[in-house]
Regions:
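Rossmann-like NAD(P)(H) cofactor-binding subdomain of soluble oxidoreductases
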Residues: 14
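ATP-dependent carboxylate/acyl-activation modules
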Residues: 1-9, 17-104, 108-141, 145-285
């Protein structure tokens, strides 16, 4: 039923070879296996070695995590080292096309306050940038929402969205993310976006050993007591306060359809022709 309801490849999420084989045998078309890695090495008894013949037999693409025998790769050089090993192994030993390899450089929470997590988002973004430079045809993916773990829902949406935008700019091809947990960049207030960027790139400021600006502390302040609903209501109020023609453009930019029909009726009542609404106002927002 799944195979006939979409033209997109279905992702089978398991590290157990028997589960993957059962899924592949019941699905028509090509699938994506999530995932392979070197957590228990690449020897004959490793999960990697047991999954690959199944993937090869069924022509599946593969999500490959930057995890090796030492653990989950945190800094960019470690991520790149594991990624290069995966790509080399998958292409030379197993004959997998680079376009069928989807590298996950891993996302870690950056709001824990622990020193060792401060640069995790930056390291992931830069690893993606370098990886796409070295292997342009290799695909990349990330589980985006891990980056904001521990924050309140409103803060998570903003951090997820800004992090995703930065990763895409660095070359990210796809993402594992719930659509309700991100928002268009145009909807994010400038101050929230700036501090989120400071947090992602660890732009702390110091006077000697004293931290004079901590983006994490500032980010927490910005969202103290803020709920997703109140954040949306605030944006709706700001939108409603704009002049009609600016409001029409802003609705297009933000992808905000709630209230659009009323604004169009108001524009017609104000004597603006349908053609003018489209050419002079709606198209301006595209």
């Amino acid at each position: 039923r799944f195979a006939t309801s979409t033209t997109l490849p279905i992702v089978l999420d398991s590290t157990e070879p028997a589960v993957l084989r059962a899924g592949l045998e019941h699905l028509g078309g090509r699938c994506v296996i999530n995932s392979v890695n070197y957590e228990d090495g690449d020897g004959p008894e490793s999960r990697f070695a047991r999954i690959m013949p199944i993937a090869k037999e069924h022509g599946a693409a593969l999500i490959a995590l930057t995890i090796d025998e030492e653990g989950q790769a945190r800094d960019r050089e470690w991520k790149l080292r594991v990624a290069r090993r995966l790509i080399s192994d998958l292409t030379t030993r197993w004959g997998i096309a680079t376009s069928d390899i989807i590298i996950d450089c891993l996302t870690f929470p950056i709001a824990t306050g622990q020193e060792e997590t401060r640069r995790d988002a930056l390291e992931t973004i830069e690893a993606i940038r370098q990886l796409k430079s070295e292997f342009p045809t290799v695909q990349t993916t990330l589980g985006v929402s891990n980056v904001s773990f521990g924050l309140n829902p409103a803060a998570r949406i903003v951090l997820n969205s800004v992090f995703l935008a930065e990763a895409v700019n660095a070359g990210l091809d796809s993402a594992i993310v719930h659509p309700s947990k991100i928002t268009p960049m145009a909807r994010i207030p400038e101050k929230q976006r700036e501090v989120a960027l400071d947090l992602i790139y660890d732009r702390r400021k110091f006077d000697g050993d004293i931290c004079t600006y901590d983006p994490l502390a500032r980010f927490l302040e910005l969202f103290e007591g803020v709920e997703v609903k109140s954040n949306r209501q605030s944006r709706a109020a700001e939108l409603a306060a704009l002049p009609l023609t600016e409001r029409l453009q802003k609705r297009i930019i933000d992808g905000e359809k709630n209230g659009l029909e009323e604004d169009l009726q108001e524009a017609r009542q104000a004597g603006i022709t349908p053609l003018s609404i489209i050419n002079d106002h709606l198209l301006e927002g595209m």
